[in-house]
């Protein structure tokens, strides 16, 4: 994929939210929508009992990520490091069609926790994206995963670390911001103003 230094361009109005499951990425997606960014048509957005307010996540992108991991025998709880050219190519082809549907409404954003593992494979499809990393206390993430999925704490903490490392490695060198979910919950106005200011500064 291309590298940041290959693109001497202004930020393009493409945003990618990255964060581990149960880290507050849906809250940040809702916030971006309030700030004027587009997640796609409402009828295309994923909804579930675990997040009745909505995930602000394209259902077809979610399924593309699921299929990409399944293609190499992986899933969100068992994200194998192995890849294959065929799996990557199939994922990029599917993702390209999905992203094209957003292009008429910049600024737009995408989110799916599995993108922490797959964002690097999207880079050839993006112009000059901004990555928004959503960070939550890993102990709180583990507690949430235990409640939702019955996941043991040691597994949840190891998974949080893996997703977080992969996400920051994927965005290395690109425009990126970090959003503290706990700070957003405790002081939403200040965090929202800060996010708006930082995004405005990026163009």
Identify the residue ranges that each predicted region occupies.
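PAPS-dependent sulfotransferase catalytic core
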Residues: 1-92
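PAPS-dependent sulfotransferase catalytic domain
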Residues: 70, 74, 96-203
